[in-house]
């Protein structure tokens, strides 16, 4: 059996896997932090504006936690392997601009956009939850758990919004 070098996340391979997913979440959250204020201004329905405002607040908290994780690991985020995700997110945002004159269609597009973004975030967040058994640092574990719980709450809010539109 080979002796793999250990990191605060576990083996080197697990560490790399973990960082790639953390970068993906950070990329998506950074995109949200940048674009949500613009989306908020274009939303028409009060419930949608409320959901966007709550997501802005939650996103800022989650980014701060992820920044702390990077700090604890002595790393900085990298969008190096996130280009496809960035393109996907920007294309979705551009689609919203195409429907800026039709309020109802635009609001539905916003809900669709947020739902797609939520799916991307939650899949990586769930993967990170699986990896937490390998993490040696309890503070990192707690930060991940807090982010995951807050992301789940965002998902519930989004599902309630979708139900209301149905």
Task: Give the positions of each predicted feature.
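Amphipathic alpha-helical hairpins
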Residues: 1-166
